[in-house]
Amino acid sequence: MSAPQKCAAVVVGAGPAGLAVIGNLLERLPGSKIAWIDPYFQAGRVNRRYREVPSNTKVSLFQAYASAVQPFRTVINTTPTPNAFSTMTKLEQDKGCHLHYAADMCRALTEGILKSDEVYRCCGIVTHADLKENLSQWTVRIKSYESLEEVQVVAPRLILCTGSSPTLLRIPVPALSIQRLDLDVVLKPSELVRAIHTGSPQTVAVVGASHSAILALLNLVDLARSSHPQLRIKWFTRNALRYAEYMDGWILRDNTGLKGVAADFAREQLEDDRLPKSEAGRFIEKIDCSDGKETAAYEAHLPSCSHIVQAVGFTRDPLPELARDGMPLKAEFDHESGGFSDQDGRVIKGLYGAGIAFPERVVDPYNNVEYAVGFFKFMKFIKRVCPRWLAA
């Protein structure tokens, strides 16, 4: 094993949050070496899985993300046009866009940032990180995809931007023969069309009323209207549809309410007074699971379904093994500071997080608590807490 690489920080993950952290660290630590660890360096899950998804973020906010720190602006100004940035400027700024535009923007920023001599790029996964508390130093072990050797990096700061994946719950009816559809597949029309058989009647159970659930319904309805005329959908939901509302200078249900294409589809076709008469209503049967009716509803309706897709949120991806002075460490995230504490409530030195796995907790003027997920929301959070991380 070669000698450990010494750096000012280690950033794990190269999705939108990891990229934002790298940009902020390069801006605030000029001349310092920053280690960046990721298996792909291809803009994370948003690029791998969600390129065909319509965003619930306005184009102008993607632009604000891309110009938020000087290292990003330098990349934009030195990238030959046409490029992902110039393409973004031609879109309608006050509307959403398909996420492939945002993913390509992140890939272009990543490509430019990786050219910096101040970035130590390591293509692989972190397997273990141990804090030497008296030295305030993390020793980070990395399984490199580019060499057979384990790589080690030593740094006073370890920032986890490790992402999340769709939540999987147990099938509500035991021993039921039903095929799971991955939410990521249902959100990708080009893949969904191949995932469901066309030659016989098929019924897909969609669980949830989130933004992802509504987009899943939209994609399945589009399929039923075109290539899969025998497809039907049973929509299991406990909650009324909830929409983001633009208030005076802020957004009610900014992180939990429907926006954009999903909101338009829901308002026009899925509301209780619209569904029976709408185009979507030709294919969708809504199953009310509210007020304790959930178990009975599943038992009555799920056995007639051939497939099930659960759109019930996202679960943090597994973290690398963490230790302090060789002893296993259980880390609890602080959604205010971006730091972590141990099982006894003690602050863990130099350990931080951001992104969908570790979002900021926000409270709106009506005292509603939400967790801020989105490109520019990650950037705002990181810009707020990064000075504190570097001063600690």
Swiss-Prot record:
EC number: 1.-.-.-
Gene knockout outcome: Does not affect the production of agnestins.
Protein name stated in the entry: Monooxygenase AgnR1
Function: Monooxygenase; part of the gene cluster that mediates the biosynthesis of agnestins, dihydroxy-xanthone metabolites. The pathway begins with the assembly and cyclization of atrochrysone thioester by the non-reducing polyketide synthase Agnpks1. The atrochrysone carboxyl ACP thioesterase AgnL7 then breaks the thioester bond and releases the atrochrysone carboxylic acid as the first enzyme-free intermediate.
Organism: Paecilomyces divaricatus
InterPro entries hit by this protein: Agnestin_monoxygenase, FAD/NAD-bd_sf
Key word Glycoprotein present: yes
PANTHER family, alphabetized: FAD_NAD(P)-BINDING DOMAIN-CONTAINING PROTEIN, PYR_REDOX_2 DOMAIN-CONTAINING PROTEIN
Any one GO molecular function term: oxidoreductase activity
Signal sequence, start to end: 1-20
Glycan-bearing residues: N134
UniProt entry keywords in alphabetical sequence: Glycoprotein, Oxidoreductase, Signal
Signal recorded as keyword: yes
